[in-house]
Amino acid sequence: MKTPNNYGLIPLKKSSNSNTTHIFVNGFMSDHIEEIKALDWQKGIKKYTNPSDCKYIFHWDSGLDYTRFKTYLPFSNGILSELERATYLLKSIVDDGLVKGVLKGIPNYFLDEWKEAQNNLKLYANLLSQEIYSMKYENQNNKIYLYGHSLGTNLIKETFKNLYKQNIKIEKTFLFGGASSGKSSEWDKISNVSTNGIYNFYSKNDDVIKYLYRRLEEDDNPIGLKQISTRSNNIFNIDTSHIVNGHMEYKKKIDTIFKKYYSI
């Protein structure tokens, strides 16, 4: 299907003989060529999939490309705005130390991009649900696996809302370091869209979710820090705090996580 600005599903591995499809969804600030190649995702699940399986990255407008920091214009919003942001960042560092202070103060620099990415979510969730609908229409036996990291988990949640209305099912879903709310009212109804389970991998060591996400969203229940609160028996919450020490470690440690907790 045609998607705006070449966003949408990008094939990483296609096969006409496969009934299994894996779709990866990256998070905030992932609009960069290395992220689109999805080498980390592919390496992480390699032992648990067949060589003939189809693999796609869902490329979406996820906000600021971090490579654009090279051309960042510090006073583009005026000197007072820049001073205010710098003052808050400095105060956070003084109060909480360098690492935690930066994570608490830096959201001021990302706020516009974060809002843009969140606003884009429903549009791209519509696109992803249409892509999945097309796959299932072409091959009802196609087992579709979804993998999401960070804000990509929220895009998957919005996609599930669409699939629920269309009565479309996928096979399984894996969420890592989720930048998404864990309220039961949002998850219970849509949990059975993923027929054989939604696996939520979280870590109490995820400072990005703990400080940056919670400041941006004012949400005390992100699924990247704690369990999804749910009455559904189709959602499995798995604490990986003893394996994952930070937000960017999830994709590097998928093999370790799957080896211990799950086999596709």
Task: Locate predicted features.
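Short, conserved catalytic or adaptor-binding loops enriched in Gly and charged residues
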Residues: I45-N50, I190-N192, G224-N233
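Conserved beta-strand elements of beta-rich interaction domains across eukaryotes
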Residues: H22, F28-S30, S62-D65, L151, ...
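Short, surface-exposed "cap/lid" segments of acyl-processing enzymes
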Residues: N6-G97
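Hydrophobic/aromatic beta-strand patches that form the interior of the parallel beta-sheet core
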Residues: T21-I23, Y56-H59, F174, Y199-F201, ...
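C-terminal catalytic-base region of ester-bond hydrolases, centering on the histidine
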Residues: I209-I264
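Hydrophobic anchor at the start of a short beta-strand
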Residues: K55, I144, G148, I235
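Serine-dependent carboxylesterase/thioesterase catalytic core
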Residues: K2-T3, D40-W41, L73-N77, S81-I223
